[in-house]
């Protein structure tokens, strides 16, 4: 079941509030959440977005929401757009907030193989945030900005060499990797197998990106090779 179903309920009702419509009660017979919780994979955001999409589908009578309104509502409930944007639009997204939430989307190259390494243990986001420094140096901030732009482009182009060189972070991974027991194995594996390694979200899941299928196993960790969804979320009937 979906541990974040409360988020789904809140987001479902929020759509009716925004559209000034009476809430149409529904009964969720079964909610299947395939995204592991508390693993840095955006499970709560997926439930929030599901609630908005379900409400929008039920209200599909000429008074439904635009994609941008769906994005705004779901992001406001989540508190940031970082997970909502790729869930809704698919592909590779870069998001920020000014007067509202903004995102830009690009498609990820199919040259890459994405391997998720999911541990059996959880890491609370609050704990992952607690280890971060309150301030960072100007040089570290500049380094992350420049490398982030290159990382975005490398994923778009399918350039493995550029991706490996662009995947240099000075703001959070050095502080968080020590919280993830076993992470040193994946870091070393990536170095030896023409891959690059990063923390998914705040952790503890680790993402390996390569241009080939990786034959990797580690006791207590679930390994999954996933494909990129470049088209985003939608409602379908089974």
Regions found by a protein language model. Name each.
Residues 155-238:
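Glycine-rich, charge-dense phosphate/pyrophosphate-binding loop(s)
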Residues 111-193:
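Acyltransferase
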Residues 26-31, 65-76, 146, 166:
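Beta-strand segments within the central parallel beta-sheet cores of soluble alpha/beta enzyme folds
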Residues 41-64, 88-90:
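DPxDG-like acidic metal-binding loop motif
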Residues 1-39, 57, 61-63, 220, ...:
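ATP-binding N-lobe of GHMP and related small-molecule kinases
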Residues 65-112, 184, 197-198, 203:
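Alpha/beta catalytic cores of group-transfer enzymes, especially the acyltransferase/condensing modules
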């Amino acid at each position: 079941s979906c541990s974040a179903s409360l988020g789904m309920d809140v987001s479902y009702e929020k759509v009716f509030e925004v559209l000034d419509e009476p809430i149409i009660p529904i009964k969720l017979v079964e909610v299947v959440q395939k995204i592991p919780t508390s693993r840095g994979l955006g499970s709560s955001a997926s439930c929030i977005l599901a609630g908005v999409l379900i409400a929008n589908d039920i209200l599909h009578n000429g008074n439904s929401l635009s994609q941008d309104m769906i994005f705004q509502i779901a992001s406001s409930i989540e508190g940031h757009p970082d997970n909502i944007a790729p869930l809704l639009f698919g592909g590779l997204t870069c998001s920020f907030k000014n007067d509202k939430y903004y995102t830009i989307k690009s498609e990820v190259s199919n040259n890459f193989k994405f391997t998720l390494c999911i541990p059996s243990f959880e890491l609370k986001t609050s704990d992952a945030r607690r280890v971060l420094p309150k301030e960072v140096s100007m040089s570290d901030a500049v380094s992350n900005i420049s490398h982030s732009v290159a990382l975005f482009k490398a994923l778009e182009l399918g350039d493995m060499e550029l991706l490996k060189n662009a995947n240099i972070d000075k703001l959070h991974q050095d502080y968080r990797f020590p919280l993830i027991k076993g992470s040193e194995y994946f870091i070393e594996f990536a170095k030896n197998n023409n891959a690059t390694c990063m923390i998914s979200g705040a952790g503890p899941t680790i993402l390996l990106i390569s241009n080939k299928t990786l034959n990797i196993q580690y006791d207590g960790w679930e390994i999954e090779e996933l494909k990129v969804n470049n088209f985003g979320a939608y409602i379908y009937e089974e």
